Amino acid sequence: MKLAVREAVASDIPALQSLIRASVLGLQAADYTPEQLEQALERVFGVDTQLIADGTYFVAEAHVDDGPVIAACGGWSKRKTLYGSDHCAGREDALLDPRHDAAKIRAFFVHPVWARRGIGSKILEVCEAAAVQAGFRRFEMGATLTGVPLYLARGYVEREHRQVPLSSGLSLPIVHMEKHL
């Protein structure tokens, strides 16, 4: 399998939306209820176009017989927002100061067909390297329960468990994780 990681562009958004839905429903069902997943897809998970505009969101394209297919996506941010798509409440688009703040690792999703092949780790390496190039020496994220094992294996530590409010009294458990260089 030939794999290439590149910056996401606006024309990728429809494919990213499909990928995110497939990833959430196909890989996170063991950690969350169907109701949590559907509400999270409406309120939390999805494309953050600010990451694409900032040039800090990446896609991994697998080159198959029919041409390139987006197998995974993920990014980092120099902004205060820790998680969430364009329609997530509580967004903070203010810029971070790399001398004092941690870069945010954001919105990692792998299509179930391409899961557990090291693609998420590859995108994470690209994101961390880009954040370091921008002057950051610390990283943090709001990880899904499904993603925690990957991030632990990549040197992140759990800081606290949090609940992201959804609707109808539901919430989405996530784990605040950090990594220092």
Predicted feature residues:
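Conserved GNAT-fold acetyl-CoA-binding loop/helix
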Residues: R21-V47
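Core beta-strand residues in small-molecule sensory/regulatory alpha/beta domains
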Residues: E61-D65
